[in-house]
Amino acid sequence: LERIAVIDFETTGITPSSSCRATEIAVVILEQGRIVDRYQSLMNAGVRVPAFIEQLTGISSAMLRSAPPAEKVMNEVNEFVGITPLLAHNAAFDQKFWDFELGRIKRTRLQNFACSLLLARRLMPTAPNHKLGTLNTFAGLPHTGQAHRAMADAEMAANLTAHLATQLRQQHGLRELSHDLLCSLQKVPAAKINEHLKRHRGF
């Protein structure tokens, strides 16, 4: 599997706005199923962290006050990622924040997001649910640290993606795996996924 940048944001809410911003970002670079590089930073966007979010993530307003400005972090992380294809678990969420925070530094995303949640729904249908922690436990993958902190979640999503890639090769006979293929598989209706994968067998 080609080089992929797996991203996770911690935020103060669900939809980005002037009062709802990213508080932490982590990126792990996955290459041939292995994590080869990492970037992580808290980011100060000048917003207050609601109490329930602080309980969930352990990130407090006080921690953010001493963190680098969000714009500086996004410039760094944008340079770190470059044009590497992107992936996140529940990418619809992280994509919104990536685009919003990039927009604030006058940058535009050029690459697509693959989604390990959508892929797992299709490739791990017997899992009890498709939360990141559940899927990692179900697949017997290593515990990466505190859930709801960006680096632990990004590493979990990367390990899960490597597991899904192995499954595509071993169970479905796919030889050439690409980010484009992952992006196309996540759009196939779950009921038709096996039939769809048969057409790719041996390629």
Segments (PLM) and residue ranges:
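Conserved non-catalytic scaffold segment of RNase H-like nuclease domains
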Residues: 1-111, 125-148
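Short amphipathic alpha-helical face segments that pack within enzyme cores
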Residues: 97, 155-159
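Conserved beta-strand -> loop -> alpha-helix junction used to position metal-binding or nucleic-acid-contacting
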Residues: 108-120
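Generic alpha-helical structural context detector
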Residues: 118-121, 133-137, 159-162
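Acidic donor-binding loop at a coil-to-helix junction in glycosyltransferase catalytic cores
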Residues: 152
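Acidic two-metal-ion nuclease catalytic site recognized across multiple nuclease folds
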Residues: 158-203
